[in-house]
Design a protein with these regions (language model features):
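N-terminal type II signal-anchor transmembrane helix
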Residues: 2-55
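Secondary-structure transition motifs
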Residues: 2-12, 73-185, 280-306, 320, ...
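Extended lipid/amphipathic-ligand handling interfaces
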Residues: 50, 63-67, 95-111, 127, ...
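A short, polar/charged loop/turn motif at coil->beta-strand junctions and beta-hairpin connectors
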Residues: 52-54, 68, 73, 89, ...
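Short acidic/polar mixed-charge low-complexity motifs
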Residues: 56, 209-211
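Short extracytoplasmic
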Residues: 56-80
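Short beta-strand segments that buttress and anchor functional surface loops
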Residues: 76-79, 200-208, 217
Length: 333
């Protein structure tokens, strides 16, 4: 008679099973602790990076991580410019949140790239009298700041409810002009889906003083030299809303008028060519001493930076000019 129950478990097997259970439980606890601590680790890393950008200071208030999406969300972020002379901080960029994630459709094609989605973002350029080269530096440095948020190349970038603002507090009167309700979508920036000369696209729309702005560009974002083909238009902007700008830079007032602007520009091999065409409708300037033609000349120069031939259509009360643009980019730095 067999006294050994074949269904019973030997002490050694029970001990091994308990050991494996302890290991599994320990790993689970470790993962839970890591999951809880990870947002704080990443948040401290990002804030450390943002506080050590030369000429800038930034901070993120909070951060959420979504492991199943391969994503994290930074909340209430701001980046200020630090004036090297006065050490005063000037607002440069802010956003309610930025969602940074792996772009899964590119991963399926064997490319590991990221996408960024910004909500309620503000990009502000300030004409700082103490640092006249600040505007150019701001434009060049902004794309470098994106690397703070992700070690991966950014292939897709989208902005919802954005605002792009230009301030000149030293002007008389102070100038504050902006594009509002801005939506920007840049795709294939890393040339994942297309390898043609201009594989990436940038599409943007915005409100501008009761008018609309549309912007379309094809670009090679990875090219060493600027390589792009763009067109943009502003339709039905109310010139009266821009009076502070014209008073400060043109020394005249506008009582009535609507503005359209058409722009085409292409760049390749360190050269660029295109044109800008402003069109003004129903213009009425303030002050009987002001001549319309001299005001128009100032207006063109204020808009495009150079003088152009002015054509007037009395039947439609519309005045327009077309200014060619051509030149070469400066030396690489």
């Amino acid at each position: 008679m067999n006294l050994i129950n074949p269904s019973s478990t030997s002490p050694s097997k029970q001990s091994k099973r308990k050991h494996l259970l302890r290991i599994g439980l320990g790993v689970l606890i470790l993962l839970i602790i890591l999951r809880i601590a990870l947002p704080y680790i990443v948040l401290n890393f990002i804030n450390n990076q943002l506080s050590n950008i030369n000429g800038y200071y930034g901070h993120v208030d909070d951060l959420d991580i979504s492991l199943y999406r391969g994503a994290y969300i930074v909340k209430d972020i701001y980046i200020d410019i630090v004036d090297t002379t006065t050490q005063k901080q000037l607002p440069f960029f802010s956003a309610d949140n930025i969602d940074i994630s792996i772009e899964w459709k590119s991963l399926l094609k064997g490319q590991i790239v990221s996408e960024l989605v910004c909500h309620t973002a503000l990009l502000r350029f300030t004409n700082n009298a103490s640092e006249p080269e600040q505007l150019e530096r701001d434009s060049n440095d902004f794309r470098l700041m994106l690397r703070t948020f992700t070690p991966l190349k950014v292939n897709r970038f989208e902005v919802f409810n954005g605002k792009i603002q230009y301030l000149d507090p030293a002007a008389s009167p102070p100038v504050d002009i902006f594009l509002d309700n801005t939506h920007i979508l840049a795709s294939n920036l890393s040339n994942v889906e297309d390898t043609t000369l201009l594989p990436a696209t940038v599409i943007a729309t915005a409100d501008i003083y009761e008018g609309k702005m549309n912007f379309n560009m094809r670009i090679n974002a990875l090219a060493i030299d600027p390589t792009y083909d763009l067109n943009a238009e502003i339709k039905n902007a109310n010139l009266v809303k821009l009076n502070a700008f014209f008073k400060a830079y043109g020394d005249f007032d506008i009582n009535k008028g609507m503005l359209d602007v058409y722009l085409e520009l292409a760049a390749k091999d360190r050269k660029y060519i295109g044109y800008v065409k402003p069109v003004i409708k129903d213009l009425d300037v303030v002050g009987p001493e002001d001549r319309k033609d001299s005001v128009l000349r100032k207006l063109w120069e204020g808009i495009v930076g150079v003088a152009g031939d002015i054509a007037e259509n009395p039947k439609t009360d519309q005045i327009a000019t077309k200014v060619p643009i051509a030149g070469e980019f400066g030396d690489r730095t």
